Swiss-Prot record:
Residues 71-80 have a biased composition (Basic and acidic residues). Involved in several stages of intracellular trafficking. Interacts with membranes containing phosphatidylinositol 3-phosphate (PtdIns(3P)) or phosphatidylinositol 3,5-bisphosphate (PtdIns(3,5)P2). Acts in part as component of the retromer membrane-deforming SNX-BAR subcomplex. The SNX-BAR retromer mediates retrograde transport of cargo proteins from endosomes to the trans-Golgi network (TGN) and is involved in endosome-to-plasma membrane transport for cargo protein recycling. This is Sorting nexin-1. The modification Phosphoserine is found at residues 32, 39, 58, 72, 188, 280. Residues 281-298 are annotated as: Membrane-binding amphipathic helix. Residues 302-522 form the BAR domain. The gene is Snx1. It comes from the Eukaryota.
Length: 522
């Protein structure tokens, strides 16, 4: 390394000639002398390699530590046709020998030598990976775990009855006791799992997938009513919603590592979840807390330092409004499709009755065939109504609830910021109080004031770290959520279009088969 003394000349700082170095090379390495008065500057340029590359117009001669060809220029810039580019970093370390350098120049023409990193370059901070890169690294870990919910079973009678679902897990992860296992869970167990996960992870900025909403009317029909089509339809909708909810839970890497999730999937019997009923004391308290948080959120005016969070929150709010409108339209479509199926069935019955009373044999047969076609079309309309609901309406409903959780993550970050600001304000008051005590010359209270200042300084530091940590988590969670949403919508839309295509193909096939019967009418 270059010494700090300004009186040393460049020739005194040159290293001794390398073994095997011919006289011409030695002369080329040490023959040129720097101009007077520029020894310090040129010495620094040689070792850092900055000035020689950035000042091509300078006529000053530079001292090279390696042999160069005769056709090279002396201003630090060399023509590519005449010689290979010089490396001025190579003298920063003694590990590079001349022989190896010359061999590299012979075997790799036209390429710049790669120097060993200097101490300054080694100590320089590495660039932090972006959140997208972190997310891609996270997605490289494939979680081989699939859950399925089947066999809804009504247990008990009357209002004390409940429905138990079979939760089957298939996995190759070593954290579980076996590769496949099954347990029985009721709806309140799913709600209890969400409450536990939300209590632990939501305050840190994580997006905990929400369970399906409660339905007092639907469950009342199941409890006190008979097993009819409406009860079976309600249970199927809830089963599918619970399966999607649980699959989102286990797909989240943080949630999967939670012991409550593993206990939910493996343990035969769980303690009864309390506070999950809508009209219970705990439920009413949660409603009150939500209302209080909504009011407090309106009073917080956050000075956003990162424009990304402000723009992303606006996107989430706008998307939630659009999804709500689209969901309302899709629900109307489902109802119209069901009405169409019902009216098509009535139309088929009327055609069958008309065909049975017709005297013309060909016309009677054609009407009977048309009635059969309409019955098949009624089945197509019913199947498509179910596809409209399960593939489209339920998807929109899920993401409306998920976007509400995303907004809650932004709100939690805002609350963390407000706590940090409140601590800073309190610290400022403590310091002002200490100044007044010093001015009033009250040493008996001064030590207590200093202790309080120390305590609040540590709190401010901790709250600032909490805010930085939750900001990082929220950004990463939103990025992950958007990728999962895109993949989810793509899969569901493709399936939905396939069902529409299949329905139209079947419809065309039915009409093509009926056309000869219509032409045979005489």
């Amino acid at each position: 390394m270059a010494s700090g003394g300004g009186g040393c000349s460049a020739s005194e700082r040159l290293p001794p000639p390398f073994p095997g170095m011919d006289p011409e090379s030695e002369g080329a390495a040490g023959g040129s002398e720097p101009e007077a008065g520029d020894s310090d500057t040129e010495g620094e340029d040689i070792f850092t390699g900055a000035a020689a590359a950035s000042k091509p117009q300078s006529p000053k001669k530079t001292t090279s530590l390696f042999p160069i060809k005769n056709g090279s220029k002396e201003n630090g810039i060399h023509e590519e046709q005449d010689q290979e580019p010089q490396d001025l970093f190579a003298d920063a370390t003694v590990e590079l020998s001349l022989d190896s350098t010359q061999n590299n120049q012979k075997t790799m023409p036209g390429k710049t030598l790669i120097p060993h990193p200097t101490q300054e370059a080694t100590n320089s901070p590495k660039p932090q990976p972006s959140y997208e890169e972190l997310e891609e690294e996270e997605q490289e870990d494939q979680f081989d775990l699939t859950v399925g919910i089947t066999d809804p079973e009504k247990i008990g009678d009357g209002m004390n009855a409940y429905v138990a679902y079979k939760v089957t897990t298939q996995t190759s992860l070593p954290m579980f006791r076996s590769r496949q296992f099954a347990v029985k869970r009721r709806f309140s167990d799913f709600l209890g799992l969400y409450e536990k996960l939300s209590e632990k992870h939501s305050q840190n900025g994580f997006i905990v997938p929400p369970p399906p909403e409660k339905s007092l009317i639907g469950m009342t029909k199941v409890k006190v009513g008979k097993e009819d089509s409406s009860s079976a339809e309600f249970l199927e909708k809830r089963r599918a919603a619970l399966e999607r909810y649980l699959q989102r839970i286990v797909n989240h890497p943080t949630m999967l590592q939670d012991p409550d999730v593993r206990e939910f999937l493996e343990k035969e019997e769980l303690p009864r979840a309390v506070g999950t009923q809508a009209l219970s004391g705990a439920g009413l308290l949660k409603m009150f807390n939500k209302a209080t948080d909504a009011v407090s959120k309106m009073t917080i005016k956050m000075n956003e330092s990162d424009i990304w969070f402000e723009e992303k929150l606006q996107e989430v709010e706008c998307e939630e409004q659009r999804l709500r409108k689209l969901h309302a339209v899709v629900e109307t479509l489902v109802n119209h499709r069901k009405e169409l199926a019902l009216n098509t069935a009535l139309f088929a019955k009327s055609l069958a009755m008309l065909g049975s009373s017709e005297d013309n044999t060909a016309l009677s047969r054609a009407l009977s065939q048309l009635a059969e076609v309409e019955e098949k079309i009624e089945q197509l309309h019913q199947e498509q109504a179910n596809n409209d609901f399960f593939l489209l309406a339920e998807l929109l409903s899920d993401y409306i609830r998920l976007l509400a959780i995303v907004r809650a993550a932004f709100d939690q970050r805002m609350k963390t910021w407000q706590r940090w600001q409140d601590a800073q304000a309190t610290l400022q008051k403590k310091r002002e109080s200490e100044a007044r005590l010093l001015w009033a010359n009250k040493p008996d209270k001064l030590q207590q004031a200093k202790d309080e200042i120390t305590e609040w300084e540590s709190r401010v530091t901790q709250y600032e770290r909490d805010f930085e940590r939750i900001s990082t988590v929220v950004r990463k969670e939103v990025t992950r959520f958007e990728k999962e949403k895109s993949k989810d919508f793509k899969n569901h839309v493709i399936k939905y279009l396939e069902t529409l295509l299949h329905s139209q193909q079947q419809l065309a096939k039915y009409w093509e088969a009926f056309l000869p019967e219509a032409r045979a009418i005489s």
